[in-house]
């Protein structure tokens, strides 16, 4: 299967290693275009518009929602996040493989508007290992950790909705599986 002009989506619970896997994938396959999300939150130190996120006012974001400008969008912690439709469609039309790294609810929305997209669920080897990884970050309060774990349980229950499930036990092995699923040589 060729990934040329195809949409692939990767999702999975917080702490499963989506970001690490996607960064490695992009390093190995620079032809892949990673979608940049839009948000209403303020830029953090060092973040650039159009590189890290497309930064919008609440009104500007809502106008794009009304115009059907997002493949998916959601509100989280008081801010809106979404995947702009235009750039994704432009890259696909140009024949580039497109990759989205988004959360479960966004993946479900993309499936409705892009049923031909290939969806991969990245899963931990065990729930205990996922908890160890989340705690190992050392950045969250116990309350935040418990919220992440509760959400992770819900997300893991949804993995059968996806075209493929890849267990991220060993990064190299998981990368090889994703490359095979995406048809990358």
UniProtKB/Swiss-Prot annotation:
Pathway: Purine metabolism. InterPro entries: GK/Ca_channel_bsu, Guanylate_kin-like_dom, Guanylate_kinase, Guanylate_kinase_CS, P-loop_NTPase. SMART domains: GuKc. The keyword S-adenosyl-L-methionine does not apply. It is found in: Cytoplasm. One of its GO terms (cellular component) is cytosol. Its main location: cytoplasm. Its EC number is 2.7.4.8. It catalyses: GMP + ATP = GDP + ADP; dZMP + ATP = dZDP + ADP. Gene3D superfamilies: Guanylate Kinase phosphate binding domain, P-loop containing nucleotide triphosphate hydrolases. It is an enzyme of class 2 (transferase). It comes from the Bacteria. Pfam families: Guanylate_kin. PROSITE patterns: GUANYLATE_KINASE_1 (PS00856), GUANYLATE_KINASE_2 (PS50052). The keyword ATP-binding applies. Keywords: ATP-binding, Cytoplasm, Kinase, Nucleotide-binding, Transferase. Residues 5-183 form the Guanylate kinase-like domain. GO terms for molecular function: ATP binding; guanylate kinase activity. ATP binds at residues 12-19. CDD domains: GMPK. NCBIfam families: guanyl_kin (TIGR03263). HAMAP family: Guanylate_kinase. Essential for recycling GMP and indirectly, cGMP. This is Guanylate kinase.
């Amino acid at each position: 299967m060729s990934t040329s002009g195809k949409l692939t989506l990767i999702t999975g619970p917080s702490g499963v290693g989506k970001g690490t896997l996607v960064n490695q994938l992009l390093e190995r396959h620079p032809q892949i275009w990673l979608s940049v999300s839009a948000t209403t939150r303020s830029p953090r130190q060092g973040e650039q518009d159009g590189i890290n996120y497309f930064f919008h006012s609440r009104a500007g974001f809502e106008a794009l929602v009304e115009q059907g400008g997002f493949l998916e969008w959601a509100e989280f912690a008081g801010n809106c996040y979404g995947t702009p439709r235009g750039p994704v469609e432009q890259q696909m039309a140009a024949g580039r493989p497109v990759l989205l790294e988004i959360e479960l609810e966004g993946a479900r929305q993309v499936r409705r508007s892009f049923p031909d997209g290939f969806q991969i669920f990245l899963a931990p080897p065990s729930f205990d290992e996922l908890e160890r990884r989340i705690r190992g970050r050392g950045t969250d309060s116990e309350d935040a950790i418990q919220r992440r774990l509760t959400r992770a349980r819900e997300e893991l229950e949804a993995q059968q909705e996806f075209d493929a499930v890849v267990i991220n036990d060993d990064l190299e092995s998981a990368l090889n599986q994703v490359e095979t699923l995406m048809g990358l040589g």
